[in-house]
């Protein structure tokens, strides 16, 4: 099946390298933006039956790339005033629901978004409910009402704000707090503040909509369900939407008027926050890497579910972006994300972002 391309100036061979890393049977999309032009390569089918070819409108599960949308939602709400980035949990959650550490009440919303809260990677108790569906839907049996119960028995791994420790729990809790304050669900809140203003019509947290079928070791997987923490990994999206999203982060004035809350939020999420003890800096959910100096600042995030792998990354100067989506879960020796990241690095280091 021949690849679909938007424009020919960005050599499709550059995208082919990423596509090959997904494996021969995968359905995938690789899209890149550089030097003011976009190129998209689509390959394979939405399922192994070979009925529907993958297009740039095919929905793939994003996994943890969802967290970047949640951080943008947080920044937008902070710009509007209902919440503050430095708002502490003690002002939002009853003391009985907080971890026993006296420092827990001081955890801020920003620390939840930047993985510096000290909370564990997963809510205590989740692994017990996950065991029966570990290879299909490990989060589906963990109910939303269990989230605060898990928080109350959590132990902080470090004082808030002192170290980076990746936490699905933290971002999931952040989403729950934002939706509780707004009095609506995650999908509706994100749609009102981010998806509709940015015209991201293919992006949703609804698992019932049309999407590609995910695969794990060649076996089909059901749609990913994460009812207690949708803000940490529930989104599905298309390459077309994700490339538009990244271009909005590159140049906020092209998608929303200057001075508007969302315009301010698109800038806010890329502001450097903290450097891990070993590794790159963090922005608001995004990993930020400037290495080796004076390399361009790269922002990126990957994600995975039991049936999908996703990568999104961009640079503002030069203006480049890469999206890579496949309906195959990452394997032990998978290089799909690493190859997509390398493409981003290569495009950003070429003069003017123009590929050769």
What is each of the regions a protein language model found here?
Residues 272-280, 291-294, 328-356:
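Short, gly/Ser/Thr-rich active-site loops of penicillin-recognizing serine hydrolases
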Residues 39-42, 301, 310-329:
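Short, well-ordered beta-strand elements
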Residues 40-45, 100-306:
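Short, surface-exposed loop or secondary-structure junction motifs
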Residues 78, 178, 249, 316, ...:
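Short beta-strand segments enriched in hydrophobic/aromatic residues
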């Amino acid at each position: 099946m021949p690849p679909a391309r938007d424009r020919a100036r960005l050599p499709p061979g550059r995208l082919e390298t990423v596509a090959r890393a997904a494996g021969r049977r995968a359905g995938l999309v690789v899209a890149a933006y550089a030097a003011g032009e976009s190129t998209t390569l689509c390959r394979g089918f939405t399922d192994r039956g070979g009925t529907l070819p993958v297009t740039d409108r095919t929905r793939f599960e994003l996994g943890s790339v969802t967290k970047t949308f949640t951080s943008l939602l947080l920044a937008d709400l902070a710009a509007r005033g209902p919440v503050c980035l430095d708002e502490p949990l003690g002002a939002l959650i009853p003391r009985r629901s907080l971890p026993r550490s006296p420092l827990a009440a001081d955890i801020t919303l920003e620390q939840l978004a930047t993985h510096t809260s000290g909370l564990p990677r997963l809510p205590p108790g989740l692994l017990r409910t996950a065991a029966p569906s570990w290879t299909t839907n490990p989060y589906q049996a963990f109910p939303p009402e269990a989230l605060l119960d898990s928080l109350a028995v959590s132990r902080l791994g470090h004082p808030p704000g002192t170290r980076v420790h990746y936490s699905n729990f933290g971002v999931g809790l952040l989403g729950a707090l934002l939706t509780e304050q707004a009095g609506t669900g995650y999908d509706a809140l994100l749609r009102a503040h981010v998806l509709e203003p940015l015209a991201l019509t293919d992006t949703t947290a609804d698992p019932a909509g049309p999407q590609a079928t995910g695969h794990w070791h060649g076996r089909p997987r059901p749609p990913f369900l994460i009812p207690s923490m949708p803000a940490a990994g529930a989104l599905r999206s298309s390459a077309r939407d994700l490339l538009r999203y990244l271009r909005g982060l590159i140049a906020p004035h092209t998608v929303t008027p200057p001075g508007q809350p969302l315009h301010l939020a698109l800038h806010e999420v890329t502001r450097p926050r903290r450097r891990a003890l070993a590794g790159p800096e963090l922005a608001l959910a995004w990993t930020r890497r400037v290495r080796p100096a004076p390399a361009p600042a790269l922002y990126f995030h990957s994600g995975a579910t039991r049936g999908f792998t996703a990568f999104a990354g961009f640079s503002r100067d030069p203006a480049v972006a890469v999206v890579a989506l496949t309906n195959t879960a990452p394997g032990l020796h998978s290089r799909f994300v690493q190859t997509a990241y390398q493409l981003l690095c290569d495009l950003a280091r070429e003069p003017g972002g123009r590929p050769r």
